[in-house]
Amino acid sequence: KSILAGDNEFDVMFLPMKGAIGLITDGAFLDLETVPTVQLDQPWWYDSYNSAIELEGRLYGAMGGAHLCIHDATRLIAFNADMMERLGLEAPYDTVREGKWTLDALNVYLSAAANLNGDDSAAWKKDGKTIYGYSNNQNGVIKFLQGCGENIVEVRNGKLTYTAGTERFYDCISKLSKVFTTSDAKGINAPNGDDSRDDDGNPGYIYVFTSGRALFSDCEVAKFQGYRTLDFEYGIVPYPKYDEGQKEYSCNTWEG
């Protein structure tokens, strides 16, 4: 209403990108590329994010160092360091630094951790004893796909471009399907909307991890504040690369 009234009450808005789409198409936002005093080439702006949302030379929102939300929303992988030690596994920090943290490397850890422990299946039971390799949220596989350097749609030459369907894309999908098997407890999909609770046997992915029943878990930085009370040590690593030939690790954000 304020924008339509033209009263210029607000100069800047902070809102999720998905909430801005309607305002952008309605013409309510100014193209930042037309504002010479907004120096988007300076290092305090996050070019990797901003270039991904710029279309046909127009940019209606931008992220920079002043936006703490993008840090809180960055997705990482948490691991149970105590469980890893009990399994006789080395924490993967050196593997990450050496550029060898790949889906194959992760699979070694998941296979070592997965254990039904006498349960009749890998299906979640609140009083069960199954240990899972990885606790995944309902959108977790997409983050692994992006960690492999793949996207379904990308901005190329200023236009949205469908980038799925390449041989490498399908190779990544195939490998992910083999890594995150659920029948053997290497992975569990925990879709509960309340990440940290177990309602009627329907667990949130954070709950599976914090209850000590998963070696790894999808997580965003903001969740780590609640990890201070855990009764085990934990560590964090980026999403793995597809293979060692991939140049960089990649972790997205909620809006990524």
For each feature predicted by the language model, list its residue ranges.
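Extracytoplasmic/periplasmic solute-binding protein
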Residues: 13, 55-75, 85, 99-161
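Early extracytoplasmic/lumenal segment of secretory-pathway proteins
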Residues: 1-17
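Hinge/lid segment of periplasmic solute-binding proteins
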Residues: 15-74, 104
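Glycine-centered hinge/linker elements that transmit conformational signals in sensory
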Residues: 107-110, 142-198
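Short, solvent-exposed loop/beta-turn-alpha elements that line the ligand-binding surface or hinge
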Residues: 33-45, 96-98, 124, 151-171, ...
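A bilobed periplasmic-binding-protein/Venus flytrap-type ligand-binding module shared by bacterial periplasmic
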Residues: 78-81, 254-256
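Paired acidic/hydrophobic, glycine-rich loop segments that form the ligand-binding mouth/hinge
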Residues: 11-14, 210, 215-219
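Extracytoplasmic/periplasmic substrate-recognition and gating elements
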Residues: 57, 227-256
